[in-house]
A protein has these predicted regions:
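Short, charged/polar, Gly/Pro-enriched secondary-structure boundary elements
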Residues: 1-5
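Charged, low-hydrophobicity low-complexity segments
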Residues: 143-144, 154-156
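P-loop NTPase catalytic phosphate-binding loop
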Residues: 7-138, 156, 161-228, 232-246, ...
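Short glycine-rich substrate-engagement loop in P-loop NTPases that contacts/grips substrate
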Residues: 137-148
Length: 264
């Protein structure tokens, strides 16, 4: 049975959700819609062999956020080494996509530019921490609440902070071409950025140890596994077997940190 995106978005659970960044992931075995909150995750790691629905899952996540959020509330940074997967999103460039001032393309396909983007995200992260420190709050949610109630002075550099969602479509490809240069900022962002509203979503085909290193893995408690080719791959991503026995085509295991939930 095909689970249509429409049925998830139309579900009461999604329509009435009070989550900060709701994501419609799929339906459970008991046919209930599963809606997760990206801010609670705080970062998401997806893996699966070719043609098992990774890109579809990625699109589902992006569509959920675009549907529920105003462009002032969330911005995306899309990194797409495959060049074609995320190009449909350049239509919303002026609204939803964040980019470096000197770039022409909003969706980064060139691996050499990725390092610049990641480093500038680190800078943005540090700048946001400074603002939080001045506002004497702990999280971006409290900060924006305070700002909306006019308790912070814009002349001192305070501004409404949108969430930033960084999506990397083929992580293995980046590691092959740039290696440590990419890994270090990604690990830094993963460790520190959740309080200032920067969230990572990483998709990769081969969940091998040299791609998903220990540091990265430690900071991604939430994981989604589509069908993978071997039990070893399944263990690498979920720390448990089972992803090698999925049917494929959108059949996935979602692990929000402690349990395994099977979704379609």
């Amino acid at each position: 049975e095909i689970v249509a995106m429409k049925s998830l978005i139309a579900s009461d659970k999604f329509q009435n959700s009070k989550m900060e960044l709701p994501i419609a992931l799929g339906k459970t075995i008991s046919n209930e819609s599963l809606i997760a909150d990206l801010t609670k995750m705080p970062h998401l790691l997806m893996a699966g062999a070719t043609g098992q629905g990774k890109s579809v899952g990625l699109n589902a996540i992006l569509v959920s956020l675009i549907y529920k959020k105003h462009p002032s509330q969330v911005k995306f940074v899309l990194i797409d080494p495959k060049k074609v997967e995320l190009t449909i999103y350049n239509k919303i460039e002026r609204h939803f996509l964040a980019k470096l001032p000197d770039e022409e393309e909003a969706i980064i396909t060139d691996t050499t530019k990725v390092v610049n983007t990641l480093n500038s995200l680190c800078v943005e992260m540090e700048a946001r921490y400074e603002l939080l420190k001045e506002a004497m709050v702990r999280t971006i949610k409290e900060y924006n609440h305070k700002f909306v109630q006019r308790k912070l002075n814009p002349e001192k550099g305070h501004k409404y902070m949108p969430y930033i969602v960084l999506v990397i479509d083929e992580f293995a490809d980046l590691i092959m071409t740039a290696g440590k240069e990419v890994e270090t900022p990604v690990a830094r962002i993963a460790q520190l950025a959740r309080a200032v509203g920067i969230h990572l979503i990483i998709a990769t085909q081969r969940p091998s140890v040299n791609v998903i290193t220990g540091t990265i893995k430690a900071n991604f408690p939430a994981r989604i596994a589509f069908r993978v080719s071997s039990k070893i791959d399944s263990r690498t991503i979920l720390d448990a077997g089972g992803a090698d026995q999925l049917i494929g085509r959108g059949d996935m295991l979602f692990s929000p940190g402690n349990e395994l939930i099977r979704l379609q």
